[in-house]
Curated annotation (Swiss-Prot):
Residues 29-39 have a biased composition (Low complexity). Belongs to the HSF family. The keyword Transferase does not apply. It is found in: Nucleus. One of its GO terms (molecular function) is DNA-binding transcription factor activity. This is Heat shock transcription factor, X-linked member 4. The gene is HSFX4.
Amino acid sequence: MASQNTEQEYEAKLAPSVGGEPTSGGPSGSSPDPNPDSSEVLDRHEDQAMSQDPGSQDNSPPEDRNQRVVNVEDNHNLFRLSFPRKLWTIVEEDTFKSVSWNDDGDAVIIDKDLFQREVLQRKGAERIFKTDNLTSFIRQLNLYGFCKTRPSNSPGNKKMMIYCNSNFQRDKPRLLENIQRKDALRNTAQQATRVPTPKRKNLVATRRSLRIYHINARKEAIKMCQQGAPSVQGPSGTQSFRRSGMWSKKSATRHPLGNGPPQEPNGPSWEGTSGNVTFTSSATTWMEGTGILSSLVYSDNGSVMSLYNICYYALLASLSVMSPNEPSDDEEE
């Protein structure tokens, strides 16, 4: 009985419906698979969903191009690049509308408001510059040698900034290597000036020490001269005084005091041996006889000998302190 009922149900399914077409629930030439694959079922559902809504892909919101991280120089992170190279890269990219080149390609034009929203307000992995403030960004431009040029006086350019640098040009990335931060240049200059400073100090100290040593040696020589001057000057001065006095006595008998100096062309001459003082004329003898020259001879003789001794000992001390191995000023420099 069960088999007959099954055959009747199967024949009813195969019976043609009105119009000669099989019923909607009947099989189409093959028996259905009692255990269909689950992957095939999922594929059928996805195909049905796509057929029901064919415009679903087209209606998805497009990705904002300005929110993408630009891949520069073999996909390196843009945030790790230097400031000039970051700026040059975003100017070269058409993605950013807030920055662009001028007509000559030697200056960058920046829209203040749009640049603030488009570039500086980026967060997280999409961040490009370390600062999010326009004032700090302008300060960075100045530190890297960018100069601001005034745009035209048209009302539409009030929010535009134009900055230029001789090493910041369109399609010339190699020039960016010449752009350096000002504080880095200042530190390099300071290091260059610090090199000869210790040598200069040593030279000054060496010259000063030699000068002090020479001064002390001269002072000692002067003291030696002052201590030895009376013993040297005494006998010669006394001798000259005695001889001048004796000569004055002899000349006093020959020439009275009221008479003037004699005019004898071939008169006797006498050379003294005390202190390099020579009396060679009778006029000098007459001055000695009158007592005018006797005191002057002693004082002049002593001062000349004292000056001679001072100069001699000072020169001797200077020569003694100078060693042959001492470098000259030119060699020290």
